[in-house]
Amino acid sequence: MAKKVIKVVKLQIPAGKANPAPPVGPALGQAGVNIMGFCKEFNARTADQAGLIIPVEISVFEDRSFTFITKTPPAAVLLKVAAGIQSGSGEPNRKKVATVKRDKVREIAETKMPDLNAASVEAAMLMVEGTARSMGIVIED
């Protein structure tokens, strides 16, 4: 018989930098999970993606064991890395902060495909372009 899931915790943690301090400690402590065990496993699994924020979905079972699934980094984080900026524009409709080439948008869309509900890469590109527009990033060919 399969173990029964009692709680699902969703967090966004910098890759390779999970530690028992907030937000990880309190979220997992309430569920009764071995926090250091999770931190070590997460850091080992995401060591190659340093500098990116990784969404993670942790399933906690009745016996306090857990499994977790790492997702692809948010499109906004990938766009900031591609554009070389710290943050998006406060006024995206008036003030543009960077430009990104369309082939870079395609690369980001292909990276995000497993987590998006898009039927094709072109549809995923439109989603990423929308995120870029809302951040004040101009897309050029």
Swiss-Prot record:
Keywords: Methylation, Ribonucleoprotein, Ribosomal protein, RNA-binding, rRNA-binding
One Pfam family here: Ribosomal_L11_N
GO BP field: translation
GO CC, alphabetical: cytosolic large ribosomal subunit
Gene Ontology MF: a single term: large ribosomal subunit rRNA binding
Description of post-translational modifications: One or more lysine residues are methylated.
Gene3D superfamilies, per database record: Ribosomal protein L11, C-terminal domain, Ribosomal protein L11/L12, N-terminal domain
Role according to the record: Forms part of the ribosomal stalk which helps the ribosome interact with GTP-bound translation factors.
Oligomer status and interactors: Part of the ribosomal stalk of the 50S ribosomal subunit. Interacts with L10 and the large rRNA to form the base of the stalk. L10 forms an elongated spine to which L12 dimers bind in a sequential fashion forming a multimeric L10(L12)X complex.
Recorded family membership: Belongs to the universal ribosomal protein uL11 family.
PANTHER family the UniProt entry points to: 60S RIBOSOMAL PROTEIN L12 (PTHR11661), LARGE RIBOSOMAL SUBUNIT PROTEIN UL11M (PTHR11661:SF1)
HAMAP family registered for this protein in UniProt: Ribosomal_uL11
Protein name: Large ribosomal subunit protein uL11
